[in-house]
Structures are given as C-alpha cells and as structure tokens.
C-alpha cells in the first residue's frame, strides 16, 4: 500500500487543482488575449450619474462634517509637524512655470507643460527637508486616515454616530494588511516611474526638444498611465475591502478581482472622475491662494515670510485623502449592491 501512497496523493492534488481551476473559470470566465463577444460579457452595474454620485459623497461627509474636518485637520497638523510642507519658493516656481507653459502650449512647446507637471509631482511627493523616517511615518499616518475614514463611514451607514476617537482607536487593526496592499499598488506603479526616468533621460540628451517628439512621448505616457490605472482598479477596491474584520491581503485582492470582472472600465471611469475633481479643486484653491498671498504680501511686507501657500497645500492634501477614501468606499458599496454574477 505504501508504494501507491504517493500516487494517491498526486491524484488528490490533481483533483483539487481541477476543482480550483473550474471555480476560478466560473468566477472569471474571460481570458486575457482571447476575444470575448460583447453578448458574453455584459454585466450590470447600476450607478448614479457622475454629478449625482459626487453630491451623494459630499452629503455623506457633510452630515458628519465635524468628524471628517477634524480628521483632515489632524493629518494636516501631522504633515506640518513632520515638515512635509514644500517651501514657498517651490510653489512660486511652479506658478511661474505654469504661467509660461500656458502660453507655450499654443506654440507647441509641450516640454514646458511636462516640466511643470513633473515639478509639481516631485514637490508633492517628496517635500524638501523631510527625512526618510518622516516620509515613512507620513505614509503610515496616511494609511491610518484612509482606514479611519472607511471605518467611520461604515459605522455611519449602519445607523450609528461614531466619534473621531472611536475611529482612530478601532480602525488601525488592518494597518499591516493595508500596508501590504499599498506595497502591491506601488509595484503596479513601477511602469510610471520608468516613464518618468525615460523622460528625464531623453530630455537630458535633447531628444524631446521638438514639439512632435514631445507630443508622441506625451501620448505614450498617457497610454501607460491609463493602463496602470486599469490594472490598479482591483487593488484600489481591495484597499477598502481590507478594512473588513479578519480580512487578509490576498483574499481582499481575490474578492476585488471578482467584483471588477466585466465592470473594470466603468469603475475606471469613476476613478478618473475622482482624479479630475481633485485636480480641479487643487487648481482652484491653490490658484486663489497664490493670488491672495501675493496681494496680501504686497500690502503688508511684514508677512512676506509667512508660508501661506505651503500650509494650504498641506490642508488640501489631507482633504483630498479623506475625500478619496470616502468616494472609493461609497463607490465600492454601490458596486457590491449590484450582485450580478459574471456573464
């Protein structure tokens, strides 16, 4: 009997593998690089309109405005204490480059536009004077703010009235699992980092000096970013699912992958709309702040050293984080409310 024991184990393993494969095909019937006819992948997804859903998220936050404003203010204070406030000179440089790029765009000088965008991303991603330890702590606090927002909204949707301290004390249990998913998202963004490196290298040798070359590279960059966002759709929803009690990272990725099957593009449109609203809010608020800052400092030179714009940027960062967390969580609730199975 011992001679046949390895064969029995092999047959059991083969049967279990076949069952897992059949279950996987039932959950996700569509294969990559194989054509699926439209009639075979129709999966319902009933969502409100873009403006209607944005208003829904706004009202959900406004009903508990004291709690969420306090949460955003807390993150802004932590960012300021850790020194994650970009210098006033950097924002002034960005402002000047943006003004120059607006005029240059009409003349086909796309390099000025990309330089302004790259400078803004660099200024927000790695503020001057922030140590690596402080950056890690900022990421950890940012994940905690994400989890706290999800926890508070989940409690509010259940009919309870939680306080901010309840969320801060209770939402941190899946912090390590959330950090694992954040690392997965960072890996998925590696192609974007490679595009930025390619842009820096090609610009240094002068290959992107002409308008046509810059335009082609810009189209390539937009394509890469779109594919990355399409790829990250499941990961973004997994960052919400991981907040459920007893959830593990791989299981959250599995559930999120099942949720977005047949709906990925429509969910991606909603995420792009979220990004558009945040960008417009940043342009509006920081534009008004820079104008007001310049006017006040011309009237009262004594306040010329007051970093008004950097602190407003810290506030906008915290508000954007809370808004994004709420938007994605409520979007997730709308998606799972339509429990249609994959076609």
Predicted regions and their residues:
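Cytosolic juxtamembrane amphipathic/interface segments immediately preceding
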Residues: 51-64, 165
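Transmembrane alpha-helical segments in integral membrane proteins
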Residues: 131-155, 234, 319-335
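Membrane-interfacial helix-loop-helix connectors in multipass membrane proteins
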Residues: 198-220, 290-308
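Alpha-helical membrane-spanning segments of integral membrane proteins, especially the hydrophobic core
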Residues: 126-139, 165-192, 212-225
